[in-house]
A protein has these predicted regions:
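Alpha-helical elements of Rossmann-like donor-binding domains used by nucleotide-donor carbohydrate transfer enzymes
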Residues: 7, 11-14, 61, 92, ...
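Short glycine/serine/proline-enriched coil/turn segments at secondary-structure junctions
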Residues: 82-86, 111-114, 129
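C-terminal glycine/acidic-rich active-site capping loop/insertion
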Residues: 125-208, 233-238
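C-terminal capping/lid region of NAD(P)-dependent oxidoreductase domains
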Residues: 22-25, 226-238
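Predominantly a Rossmann-like dinucleotide-binding segment in NAD(P)-dependent oxidoreductases
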Residues: 3-85
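Glycine-rich phosphate/pyrophosphate-binding beta-alpha loops
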Residues: 56, 106-114
């Protein structure tokens, strides 16, 4: 759960809280790479698999973005593509919360390019692309580009030919550079995570990541696994 302390997530959340994209309608999150795993995390009896290993971080971030510990409406798929164990290495789920926003999360072990972003975020005022090393967002000011009044009749040009909707949006684009060193990025977010634990245990600060919150995250895991039962094929060696 240290990923909630990542620079990219903190900056992304700050921008979304400012409503730079207006009302967020769709969030697509992905952890794509090419991998053929053969370690303990490919084994169900050891609680392995793409969801509990990789997607767990993203699902917790999505819960925070939604601002809710509710069990969302979930549609999911889990399969074994490249790994040698019995736990899933591919996972895809859509989660719709009561706020109306749809969240998608994917872990794909067959992406040899792996050049996509971590998050694509779509709102009524624009779009955001979130990478570990930068955030790009394109948006407009609704006061500069007011919505047109509804027209019930067919649109026509002055010469009588058919016309089509034109928005003439004045786009603004911004980029925020982040630390490109992945090992340093992981070290920073982990340090922040354990620093908060220290402050809670030693100085009585409010616990940032509460057990009740994690309990609801596990409920999401359980629902995805209920929809995608995988047979246990391996057990602990004697």
């Amino acid at each position: 759960h240290q990923y909630r302390y990542n620079d990219y997530y903190l900056e992304m959340k700050k921008l979304l809280d400012k409503k730079v994209l207006g009302d967020v309608k769709l969030v697509r999150a992905r952890q794509n790479f090419f991998a053929r795993r053969y370690d303990w995390q490919t084994l169900l009896y050891r609680e392995g698999g793409a969801m509990r290993n990789n997607a767990a971080h993203t699902i917790e971030q999505i819960m925070d973005l939604a601002g809710s510990d509710e069990l969302p409406e979930i549609h999911s798929r889990m399969e074994i593509w490249n790994s040698v164990g019995d736990a899933e290495d591919y996972m895809f789920a859509t989660m719709k919360y009561s706020n109306g926003t749809v969240y998608e999360v994917e872990v794909n072990p067959s992406d040899a390019y792996a050049d996509g972003c971590l998050f694509d975020i779509y709102g009524t005022l624009g779009t955001m692309k979130v990478y570990s090393s930068k955030i790009q967002y394109k948006y407009f000011d609704p006061e500069e580009c007011p919505m047109f009044a509804l027209e019930h009749k067919s649109l026509h040009n002055p010469d009588g030919s058919p016309a089509y909707c034109t928005n003439n949006i004045k786009w603004k684009e911004e980029t925020i550079a982040l630390d490109p060193d992945m090992m340093n990025v992981f070290g920073k977010c982990s340090s922040r995570f354990y620093h908060d634990w220290y402050e809670h245990l030693v100085n009585g600060a409010e616990l940032y990541m509460k057990p009740e919150h994690i309990k609801h995250q596990i409920e999401i895991f359980n629902e995805v696994e209920r929809q995608n039962p995988l047979p246990v094929k391996f057990s602990k060696p004697e």
